[in-house]
UniProtKB/Swiss-Prot annotation:
Keywords: Glycoprotein, Heme, Iron, Membrane, Metal-binding, Monooxygenase, Oxidoreductase, Transmembrane, Transmembrane helix, Virulence. SUPFAM superfamilies: Cytochrome P450 (SSF48264). Pathway: Mycotoxin biosynthesis. It is an enzyme of class 1 (oxidoreductase). One of its GO terms (biological process) is gliotoxin biosynthetic process. Heme binds at C449. Belongs to the cytochrome P450 family. The gene is gliF. Pfam families: p450. Glycans are attached at N197, N299. It is a single-pass membrane protein. Its cofactor is heme. It comes from Aspergillus fumigatus (strain ATCC MYA-4609 / CBS 101355 / FGSC A1100 / Af293) (Neosartorya fumigata). This is Cytochrome P450 monooxygenase gliF. The chain crosses the membrane at residues 13-31.
Amino acid sequence: MDQVYLPQSVRTAVAVSFGVGLLYWVYRLLLQKTKSLKALDLPVLQSVGDQDIVKTLEEGHAKYPDTPFALGVPGQQLVVLPVSEIDTVKALPENQLSIKKHHYNQFLGEYSYMGTKADEFDDAMRYLLVRNTPAVLASFTAEIDYAMSTVLQVPPNSWTRVKPRSIMPKVATILSGRAFVGLPLSREPDWIESNVNYTQDVSRAWMVLRFYPHWIRPLVAPFLREVKTLEQNKALIGRKIAKLLADQEAQKLSPAQEKIPGGDMIDWFKSRYQAQGKTATAQQLTRDQLLATFASIYNLSNALTYVMFDLAANPAAVDELREELDQVLGPNVGAESIDKTALPRLIKLDSFVRESQRLSPTSLVNIPRIVTDPNGLRLKTGHVIPPGYLVMVRAQPINQSPTLYPNPERFDAFRFARLRQQGGANENRWQHTSTGADNINFGHGIWACPGRFFASAEIKVVVAYVIRHYDLRLIEGRPHPKPKYGGLAIFPDAGAEVELKPRV
């Protein structure tokens, strides 16, 4: 059949009509959201784009510092709670406030497994992972040289530009994979690529699908490239896990071999199922592995990226961190020697990492929950939030509090080390992994991130390795890279660079 060519004027008219129709559809969606939020009898703030969200939240907090307000952002609507409500929400069970429902909705649980985790997964993460931090740390230190030398190939005797956001997902995948599934699987190129892509595709798919109503997502999602590759990566990882389990069964029949660090997480997952009289299937363990992978790679690689920016911007602090490594590990001893006794003594390093997180958290708000109590969520302010609504606690007023942190806008590398020197409860209160009303960047309460000890240990091993082996600096004439925003999420600039030079 001959092709039909429309005149330019006709094509333009069609394009304009489509654009007008699309704008009207978006307008109708925003209008529907506003009506829904107005039904709450709360003040409503509307952010029309990702880049004005910070300003909108600051405006809301300035006007309503001690009471909730409703917020509409691109693709999302929620109730923003004041800091005073942290104690209200921190300990409520799933049948009153659900973090799982939030994760399922936010991270496309029907495609990603998010929000579908089993009790056995929670037990393994909450108890076995925390209890066995020394074993996890041993896997990191055993793998750090391989991970960094594989991913970060910098020629000697010269400054080389690198993009931390490009390299850190692979570093996090290799290190976490050593702890999760062990060698040799954790080093297989297709395993690394699939885990990195899975994590990135979850967030990319959400960035697109958030603009569609929930009822239409099942119609749109199968046609998205991100969802297609998400399914492909899930399938490959599932096949790898099934083979790993088969190999483990076969090894039981072989003579015992000396245990090398790594591969503990899969065993911990299996043990929690066995404790309940169950045998974990390959599909269940694949789901558990992917859930752990997303948490470790996405948040961890972002945190490592921010830390790299902060190291490059603060050379004097880097010198002090190296001195601390000398004092704790010994002169010129590398990150490979960090163990369970050395890690808690790296107080300045802990402070540096927490300060980086304070100024570059994962989200502008935290402690996300969907109200599931049929009677709603009753706040201290007297407001009742009906079931089905998303609530979150504002985090920026804490992170930027001049009362808690003098000159809060300034990066002060050893701010928390000085606070810990005050002694008493301050020793624990100001650690990187501590949560409370003064730090909700890991959440708080019964659903505080159980992997924060895992993440903190991994970040410190990477930082120790980097500053032992490289000098860092910002590119001359360029400012400290600024974060990007997608909805309420904060993520580092993927195009931002720093310069590295191997140390002699």
